[in-house]
Regions:
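S-adenosylmethionine
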Residues: 89-208
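Conserved SAM-binding loop of SAM-dependent methyltransferases across substrates and taxa
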Residues: 74-87
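A generic structural signal for ordered alpha-helices
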Residues: 3, 7, 26, 30-36, ...
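Flexible, active-site-adjacent loop/turn segments at secondary-structure boundaries
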Residues: 12-13, 36-37, 45-46, 74, ...
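Conserved beta-strand/loop positions that form the S-adenosyl-L-methionine
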Residues: 70-72
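Class I SAM-dependent transferase core
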Residues: 1-68, 83-84, 98-115
């Protein structure tokens, strides 16, 4: 695992007594992620800071309940959040078979009994009970992501999307979509200031 980033000091603070599970996940991803097409070759030197800890910053935002993660991929951030928040039930939604296989393997290997994995596209998911929150990281622009995820939410449920520096422009471009979807209390929160080198921007909105 040449070039694997050393664990930053912030890791223990973010994961607490779940840090060993986070370390195991990081080691598994560093060992197999590139060969299985889960992460690119340039990600190992920043796997902790850019991906795992960046994802973990969202954990305190989550409510106790059932959270769906759309486009779970390598588990960044769905598995990371499931490690950090054992009191929350997670439904990881991912359409690609090889990624689903990885997610299922890690759920079993890490003993995560608060995770279900669905192989499906978000628009094809039919849940018996609507979700309390839906998360997504690096999936698509808000104008496309909102129509895919709002049908999964209960009334009063919340979208929690990790976004980049252009999130304000995305919100402006998606203004009509946001109104049509019935979203209120739309805001952007900046997380991780003074904790990690790069802050995390989170788009939050509540379904009426």
């Amino acid at each position: 695992m040449t070039g694997f980033e050393q664990e930053p000091d912030a890791a223990v603070a973010l994961f607490g007594d779940r840090i060993e599970l986070a370390r195991r996940f990081a080691a598994d991803l560093a060992r197999e992620g590139e060969t299985r097409g889960l992460i690119g070759p340039l990600e190992l030197p920043r796997l902790w800071s850019r991906h795992i800890l960046n994802s973990a910053l969202v954990a305190p935002v989550l409510r106790v309940g059932v959270v769906g993660d759309v486009g779970s991929g390598a588990g960044l951030h769905g598995l990371v959040l499931a490690i950090a928040r054992p009191d929350v039930r997670f439904v990881l939604i991912e359409p690609m078979e090889r990624r689903v296989d990885w997610l299922l393997e890690e759920v079993q290997a890490l003993g995560l009994d608060n995770v279900d994995v669905l192989r499906a596209r978000a628009e094809d998911v039919r849940l018996a009970t609507p979700l309390d929150q839906v998360t997504a990281r690096a999936v698509s622009a808000l104008s496309k992501l909102i129509p895919l995820t709002v049908p999964l939410l209960r009334s009063g449920g919340e979208l929690v999307f990790m976004k980049g520096e252009r999130v304000d422009a995305e919100i402006e471009a998606a203004a009509k979509v946001i109104r049509k979807a019935g979203l209120v209390d739309v805001r952007v929160e900046v997380l991780g200031e003074g904790v990690l080198p790069e802050v995390t921007r989170v788009f939050r909105a509540t379904l009426r």
